[in-house]
């Protein structure tokens, strides 16, 4: 039941056009990467309810104004995501987080990849994702 609630909702949009859906299409458009995930004994398990509670508490903490206040304003923040990641609800969830950070005066750099799903480092365009991340890292400058 819990597995269906967690993974089923995430995969729903990708099952409509796929009679052979395996339940994990939401992770990536790269079928080989999805298969690796399915074959890995440490992936795809249903977390304990307490673990989920901690995960959801962390999501709330990431947007809590008192916690955000403690993030150094000079800390560079890079956020990347696929536009088809169901976890972000059409980017609404991630934009809510970004707005909370920006309202605090934090500087964020964002990169959204069209049609990308949940695991952008395992997507069909992962080379671009990695290249953009490395370019951002190489352009950082820190004051000492």
Q: What function would you assign to each model-found segment?
A:
Residues 62, 102-144:
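Catalytic active-site module of serine/aspartate enzymes centered on a nucleophile-bearing elbow/loop
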Residues 79-81:
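Short beta-strand/loop motif that positions the catalytic acidic residue
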Residues 47-69:
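Active-site nucleophile elbow and catalytic-triad environment of alpha/beta-hydrolase enzymes
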Residues 93-100, 129:
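A general structural detector for well-ordered alpha-helical segments in enzyme core domains, enriched
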Residues 68-73, 104:
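Short, conserved loop/helix-junction motifs that constitute active-site signature segments
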Residues 1-42:
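Alpha/beta-hydrolase-fold enzymes
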